[in-house]
Regions:
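Active-site/ligand-binding-proximal alpha/beta "capping" segment
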Residues: 13-14, 91-116
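Feature captures the catalytic cores and cofactor-binding loops of soluble hydro-lyases/lyases
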Residues: 1-87
Length: 116
């Protein structure tokens, strides 16, 4: 149940969302513009979960509905369908095209520019 670094999936995350009807992606580290556009197009969200907390996260899974591409990608990278309750995650990319990752990057760049 522990999240994996998401940016590795960036090149094809939009296709995966379309093919499997995914409305939520759980990971850590954030995603980029292609995934943000796919979230907007498919009414989906990116959920940033806590790395290193697999046991806590696993306790929130109430049912495994299915798994796809397990042989191709292995367990950590497979596409898992879960039912969850009280899953501790932060929505950092939403279906309106908003990205907390982009917002924080812009604020950080502004703060650093003011120090120069």
């Amino acid at each position: 149940a522990g999240p994996t670094t998401s940016i590795r999936e960036e090149p094809y995350q939009g296709d995966i969302m379309r093919w499997f009807g995914i409305r939520g992606v759980i990971g850590k580290g954030g995603m980029a513009d292609k995934t943000l556009a796919a979230c907007k197009e498919h009414g989906a969200v990116y959920l940033h979960a806590i790395g290193g907390a697999a046991q806590v996260l696993a306790e929130c899974i109430t049912k495994v509905r299915g798994v796809h591409m397990l042989e191709e990608f292995g367990s950590p990278e497979a596409i898992w369908e879960f039912e969850m309750k009280a899953f501790p995650a932060v929505v950092t990319m939403d279906s309106h095209g908003e990205s907390l990752h982009k917002d924080i990057l812009a604020k950080s760049e502004d703060a650093l520019a003011q120090r120069r």
